[in-house]
């Protein structure tokens, strides 16, 4: 037995979450450990027939103020904070008739769960734990003498340690680190929520941002093999792609996650059944279909079958057996969906390496952050929900008003172009992209690329002719539009707002092309 183990003779237990409490209490009692406990925890232990000392018996002071004060007392904290390596501490304990604790087991009031439930302000405030964090921090500070455990998932470690003569110093230090992280996350949640309650409605961004993330996985590498990488999750946030359930395939890579996030967002930009195929965070193809999700996948893939090789597929509907059969014929890195029809996973998993994920619908009110040197940029995520994203609010600037069918085509293109890196021009026909010009430093080249890809990837077919186009930002000159008109594009939707809008609109009228202005922009960098 290592000399730095601290035999557990006395334990303080105060937990809101009673998971595993019975096994823990019985194991401690069987090992001869004295248990001191509080409130409902003490009552639960007593109901088990396990000897327990209520904390008020220890302090000689009753629980008061509706339970707000239970453990905030020197008889408790002196027993936690005494450094038993020091003779003067031991002497003071003896003089004060205080016995030291070697183990503190505490978990906190469910503050974040209460906030998430929609409870009112006072109810949320009532769930801000005071005594719990005080005990946890005290025990963590005094880890040379005390082990602190804040999660029921670690109770098995306590039971093992009791049988082995206590925790080692290294184990107590690791537990202390876990405890400080726990209280730090708790305080961040409280401070963030309180700040939101007093925020000025005209200033939607908080004066202070705190965040806590837990490492979920160390990845093989980052964007490139020489870059180390890891995945972290926010335990207080609603589940998202980072918490997706993987049903099959190799481990997710850094690039798999970035492409999957782009694909998942792109698919859910559409209310209709949609499939998005993404590679290097840009669409190879996006399509909607009211016929079947398999049809949406077929037409999305047809946009650019060359680039779709090794891509990421996202569906905003259940993946059908028919779609699974189509996907199984193509090399695909990742497929993500809210669910899979019976038999679909069996078909997909015939490919050993394909990663099959189940993920919840993305949250619609997220802020997004981007690190820059010395700080972080924060913005509301582009959810394609600006006033100008609704066709009813568009302005007809040139040509004849669109039919219901044509307007639906334009709306699809407009929603799809959000997923394309700027400068972006997207061509669509029949509810599917047919040519995507992405990531160009001028709009003329983006238009040329969209037309070239629409036509060159279709053999003898000139898919640009008769298509509709969406531009993520205005045309600064008429030249970008003229590329589209010469290719036979029949209608264009774009934000407008250029000082040369009149020139662009005049060119559209001359070409007989319908043009709508949205007043909204969808840059993506």
From Swiss-Prot:
The keyword DNA-binding does not apply. Pathway: Purine metabolism; IMP biosynthesis via de novo pathway; 5-formamido-1-(5-phospho-D-ribosyl)imidazole-4-carboxamide from 5-amino-1-(5-phospho-D-ribosyl)imidazole-4-carboxamide (10-formyl THF route): step 1/1; Purine metabolism; IMP biosynthesis via de novo pathway; IMP from 5-formamido-1-(5-phospho-D-ribosyl)imidazole-4-carboxamide: step 1/1. One of its GO terms (biological process) is 'de novo' IMP biosynthetic process. It catalyses: (6R)-10-formyltetrahydrofolate + 5-amino-1-(5-phospho-beta-D-ribosyl)imidazole-4-carboxamide = 5-formamido-1-(5-phospho-D-ribosyl)imidazole-4-carboxamide + (6S)-5,6,7,8-tetrahydrofolate; IMP + H2O = 5-formamido-1-(5-phospho-D-ribosyl)imidazole-4-carboxamide. Residues 1-150 form the MGS-like domain. One of its GO terms (molecular function) is phosphoribosylaminoimidazolecarboxamide formyltransferase activity. PROSITE patterns: MGS (PS51855). Gene3D superfamilies: 3.40.140.20, Methylglyoxal synthase-like domain. Keywords: Hydrolase, Multifunctional enzyme, Purine biosynthesis, Transferase. The IMP cyclohydrolase activity resides in the N-terminal region. PANTHER family: BIFUNCTIONAL PURINE BIOSYNTHESIS PROTEIN ATIC, BIFUNCTIONAL PURINE BIOSYNTHESIS PROTEIN PURH. Belongs to the PurH family. This is Bifunctional purine biosynthesis protein PurH. It comes from Corynebacterium diphtheriae (strain ATCC 700971 / NCTC 13129 / Biotype gravis).
């Amino acid at each position: 037995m290592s000399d730095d183990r601290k035999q557990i003779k006395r334990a303080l237990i105060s937990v809101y979450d009673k998971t595993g409490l019975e096994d823990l209490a019985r194991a401690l009692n069987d090992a001869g450990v004295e248990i001191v406990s509080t409130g409902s925890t003490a009552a639960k232990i007593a109901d088990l027939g396990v000897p327990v000392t209520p904390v008020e018996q220890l302090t000689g002071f009753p629980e008061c103020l509706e339970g707000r004060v239970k453990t905030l007392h020197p008889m408790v904290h002196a027993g936690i904070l005494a450094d038993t390596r020091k003779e003067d501490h031991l002497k003071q304990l003896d003089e004060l008739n205080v016995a030291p604790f070697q183990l503190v087991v505490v978990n906190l009031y469910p503050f974040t769960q209460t906030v998430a439930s929609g409870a009112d302000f006072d109810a949320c405030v009532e769930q801000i734990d005071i005594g719990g964090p005080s005990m946890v921090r005290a025990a963590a500070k005094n880890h040379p003498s005390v082990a602190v455990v804040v999660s029921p998932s670690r109770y098995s470690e306590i039971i093992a340690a009791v049988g082995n003569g206590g925790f080692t110093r290294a184990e107590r230090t690791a537990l202390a680190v876990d405890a400080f992280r726990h209280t730090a996350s708790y305080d961040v949640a409280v401070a963030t929520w309180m700040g939101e309650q007093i925020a000025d409605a005209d200033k939607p961004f908080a004066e202070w941002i705190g965040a806590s993330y837990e490492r979920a996985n160390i990845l093989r590498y980052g964007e490139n093999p020489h870059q180390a990488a890891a995945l972290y999750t926010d335990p207080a946030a609603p589940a998202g792609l980072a918490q997706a359930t993987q049903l099959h395939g190799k481990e997710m890579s850094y690039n798999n996650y970035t492409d999957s996030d782009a694909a998942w967002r792109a698919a859910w930009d559409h209310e209709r059944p949609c499939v998005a195929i993404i590679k290097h965070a840009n669409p190879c193809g996006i399509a909607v279909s009211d016929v079947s999700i398999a049809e949406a996948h077929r037409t999305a893939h047809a946009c650019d079958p060359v680039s779709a090789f090794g891509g990421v597929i996202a569906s905003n509907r259940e993946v059908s057996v028919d779609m699974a059969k189509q996907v199984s014929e193509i090399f695909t890195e990742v497929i993500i969906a809210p669910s899979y029809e019976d038999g679909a996973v069996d078909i997909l998993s015939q490919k050993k390496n394909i990663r099959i994920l189940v993920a919840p619908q993305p949250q619609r009110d997220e802020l997004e952050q981007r690190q820059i040197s010395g700080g972080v940029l924060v913005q509301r995520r582009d959810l394609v929900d600006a006033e100008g994203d609704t066709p009813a609010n568009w302005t007809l600037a040139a040509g004849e008003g669109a039919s219901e069918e044509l307007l639906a085509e334009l709306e699809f293109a407009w929603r799809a172009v959000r997923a394309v890196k700027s400068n972006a021009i997207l061509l669509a026909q029949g509810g599917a992209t047919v040519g995507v010009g992405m990531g160009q430093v001028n709009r003329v080249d983006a238009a040329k690329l969209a037309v070239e890809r629409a036509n060159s990837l279709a053999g003898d077919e000139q898919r640009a002719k008769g298509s509709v186009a969406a531009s993520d930002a205005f045309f600064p000159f008429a030249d970008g539009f003229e590329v589209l008109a010469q290719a036979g594009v029949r209608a264009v939707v774009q934000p407008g707002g250029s000082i040369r809008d009149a020139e662009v609109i005049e060119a559209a009228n001359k070409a007989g092309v319908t043009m709508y202005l949205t007043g909204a922009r969808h840059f993506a960098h």
